[in-house]
Amino acid sequence: MDKKLIALDLDGTLLNSDGIVSEISKSYFKKIKEQGHIITIATGRILKDTLIGTEGAEFAKYIVSDTGAAVFRNEDTETKWKEVYINQLSKETVQNIASYYDKNKFTTIEIRDRNSAHHYDGTINIMEILEKLSEITHLTVVFLNNEFAKEYLDLFKSKFPNLEIEMMQDSFGDKKWLDILQKGVEKYKGITEVAKLEGISNENIIAFGDGLNDIEMLKKCGVGVAMKNALPEVKEQADYITSETNNQNGVVEFLKEYLVEI
């Protein structure tokens, strides 16, 4: 069997509703990692939050964080996770986005670098935050209601054509927000950087997801698998749908059958 790159979204996919990677999943991924398959986490989270949520992600060789803006490799050394790819936003871009802040419409603008997240709510000078950051990877803009999110999606896309601006939605509710990244940044881009490093063809990439920011990787990777609990529009774009949810080890149950069949 050819070596596979297995790309895993976290929230709603690998993590259960308690935000935990099950012991069954950890044990299974350790087993297939030893067989030579490349386990890669692909998430919208920053590195720090990814490691907290997965208790160190020992089962993974790579982490694609910030919706594809950065890639880290498990070096099995004291420094552990080494950055091998980054596509960052300029501070000028962040200032321009922040200039639209309106307390009557916005809740917060979350500004992320590789390892931290800072919240801007209009009460301080944006430069006080930017001075603390070196490599800005990702903005998350949260609104008081979904109508404002739709309003600013159209506005920002017209004003900032050089940015990747997407409407996101909670898989377990209807809350919407905007993710803003450098043009061309998406989970699939980060995954392809891992594939290049490992010499793996696209047909040997298996991606799992449940949310709107997983659609492109499910469409573009060789095999796209939507979770049973995924949003309907995500399922429509997938090659397969797991028979079990994220609370029932859906990823593992799928791989146990799929990797045997091929």
Language model features with spans:
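Active-site phosphate-binding/coordination module
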Residues: 21-121
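Asp-based phosphoryl-transfer active-site loop
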Residues: 2-19, 218
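Mg2+-dependent phosphoryl-transfer enzymes with acidic/Ser/Thr/Gly-rich catalytic loops
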Residues: 1-3, 22, 181-262
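Short active-site oxyanion
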Residues: 36-40, 59-61, 138, 203-204, ...
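A short acidic, helix-capping loop that chelates divalent metal ions and anchors anionic groups
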Residues: 14, 80-81, 173-177
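Conserved acidic, metal-coordinating active-site core of Asp-based
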Residues: 100-208, 212-217
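Short, hinge-like loop/turn segments at secondary-structure boundaries
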Residues: 57-60, 80-86, 125-131, 182-184, ...
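Short, structured coil segments at secondary-structure junctions
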Residues: 56-59, 66-67, 159-161, 220-221, ...
